[in-house]
């Protein structure tokens, strides 16, 4: 090309300069430049490595260049006509590129740096997740250890309460002593530590039922012996009154009771005007007899409370004893001397006392032979069933067991529980003052709520 033609050739337009500047800015971005360089190197390496692919790519490049040249030649008039609009678009694109560079600083960094930073972020995130997982595992281990310690404390406290309130029986002590004689046998505490929670809980429940049964049976034996003692003294009193009415000197038994002691003391007193006053001794004897009957009445009440939940045959035995005591008490109510008590009443009373003595023996045999029933909770639940309202010293009793007040017992409302039970079974109506018209039959399996620490 000559110098004249070069001088006459038109220079690049303003749009081309702006367009070139925009393209240069985009191409000058480090991330774009590094990425394009990496792609170009990979493209060139692929062409050199595969000759056939290289020939095809060179042919495609030649075609694309021809098409681009022809497209630019045909689009040149249109681009010249739209030069102001394209300049405005270019300016807006430059402004958007400025904002994009501010929001995305990694555009000013090479691709290697961006990849390295991304790897660092991913590694940091993975490390954080691993740390959280380890921390969660550590928390779970600590929680498991805390729950295990809490279970140990609860079981140890329950076992201490059982050992304190229900001591070991003679059979258990003998079995424990026999086990201790064997080789390499640890103590009870060591054996409990090596047992699982469910094994310890099951053995504790079984032992609690057995000890509660033995404890209740022991209480029933005590009441039985006390009732028989009262019946024997009343039998001696009736025999003494019968002999005195017949004019026979009473015979002192081998083990004299209160009545015979009273008459021996009276016989040793000095004479008054050469005779003794029988009326005073008879009055004191009758008063003593009424006291024995009242004491026997309270013992029968305790027996009746203890046999709730047992078969009807056992309850009938206690009811027969109560009827005998009530009949004898009615006969002695207004008597002031022996003559006020009819001989027929004395004879019937002696027979009733003998039958009552036999009934008490049969009652204990029924309890021992029967399978332990809902009364296994022994002296706890029947008291709650019998009382229409909480006892006045309930808080003191609870504090004595657990060592302090506890809000868990704020919901214990015996009248409300009784009314709910009546409404559920549809038996009886409740009068004003929360007093039932008829005493409802207690549930067949009353639940002990006085000592929640022993509820399993």
UniProtKB/Swiss-Prot annotation:
Interaction with PNPLA2 and ABHD5: region residues: 185-456
UniProt PTM comment: Phosphorylated by PKA. Phosphorylated on serine in skeletal muscle at rest or upon lipolytic stimulation.
Keyword rRNA-binding: no
InterPro entries: Perilipin
Gene symbol of the encoding locus: PLIN5
GO biological process terms, semicolon-separated: lipid droplet organization; lipid storage; mitochondrion localization; negative regulation of fatty acid beta-oxidation; negative regulation of lipase activity; negative regulation of peroxisome proliferator activated receptor signaling pathway; negative regulation of reactive oxygen species metabolic process; negative regulation of triglyceride catabolic process
Similarity comment: Belongs to the perilipin family.
Protein's UniProt name: Perilipin-5
Region feature Disordered, mapped onto this chain: 418-456
Entry GO CC: cytoplasm; cytosol; lipid droplet; mitochondrion
Domain of life per record: Eukaryota
Assembly description: Homooligomer. Interacts with PNPLA2; prevents interaction of PNPLA2 with ABHD5. Interacts with ABHD5; targets ABHD5 to lipid droplets and promotes interaction of ABHD5 with PNPLA2. Interacts with LIPE.
Function comment: Lipid droplet-associated protein that maintains the balance between lipogenesis and lipolysis and also regulates fatty acid oxidation in oxidative tissues. Recruits mitochondria to the surface of lipid droplets and is involved in lipid droplet homeostasis by regulating both the storage of fatty acids in the form of triglycerides and the release of fatty acids for mitochondrial fatty acid oxidation. In lipid droplet triacylglycerol hydrolysis, plays a role as a scaffolding protein for three major key lipolytic players: ABHD5, PNPLA2 and LIPE.
Region (Essential for lipid droplet targeting): 1-173
